[in-house]
């Protein structure tokens, strides 16, 4: 007997549609799949966000996109402009990459100011922000300091990875991030969560969201375990997460 309800897991998933090779047809079918499986959000290439938001209107699935993606090296001004454009285009949740170079350099004032400026404009518009650390490049001391900064700035989520670095979410990182983030900050796993068992494991560690491209496989298995009918829909490839 499963110890979860369907929406406990479906509403964890941010369905990832970020690979640069996805065509318009791929993106549209991916959005349709996300709606059918009742996920939390679709995280889509920024240029397609306006169409995505229109398709998602009234479905209960949120539109999200990326800022400073995937390496975080954009200037603060560019990241703010990206965020403003995304919000104008209907974005409800922004996945923002920190300046990894500044984190590794110990430029904490720069890092805090940048996160703060983008968080402020996001919250002023009534939307939410997820701050991506890209943990595969960081030491624990960096991750802990980022959690402290994000707690102070009242960001909505701290997120492990872009899914495009040298590694994705690890159980140790999720424990660390949950331990060092305030109660007001949620944790998102990204990269490497490709089956239902792993999704349930990250949920048990306190992650409330998970970036995923294997949505149909994971939620198809959940529906099977819960005795729910299968969803007959296919979407063309979205690899990366």
UniProtKB/Swiss-Prot annotation:
It is found in: Cytoplasm. Coiled coil: none annotated. It catalyses: 2-deoxy-D-ribose 5-phosphate = D-glyceraldehyde 3-phosphate + acetaldehyde. The active site is at 95 (proton donor/acceptor), 159 (schiff-base intermediate with acetaldehyde), 188 (proton donor/acceptor). Pathway: Carbohydrate degradation; 2-deoxy-D-ribose 1-phosphate degradation; D-glyceraldehyde 3-phosphate and acetaldehyde from 2-deoxy-alpha-D-ribose 1-phosphate: step 2/2. Keywords: Cytoplasm, Lyase, Schiff base. GO terms for cellular component: cytoplasm. It comes from the Bacteria. SUPFAM superfamilies: Aldolase. It is an enzyme of class 4 (lyase). GO terms for molecular function: deoxyribose-phosphate aldolase activity. Its main location: cytoplasm. Pfam families: DeoC. Its EC number is 4.1.2.4. GO terms for biological process: 2-deoxyribose 1-phosphate catabolic process; carbohydrate catabolic process; deoxyribonucleotide catabolic process. The keyword Ribonucleoprotein does not apply. Catalyzes a reversible aldol reaction between acetaldehyde and D-glyceraldehyde 3-phosphate to generate 2-deoxy-D-ribose 5-phosphate. NCBIfam families: deoC. Belongs to the DeoC/FbaB aldolase family. DeoC type 1 subfamily. This is Deoxyribose-phosphate aldolase. It comes from Rhodopirellula baltica (strain DSM 10527 / NCIMB 13988 / SH1). The gene is deoC.
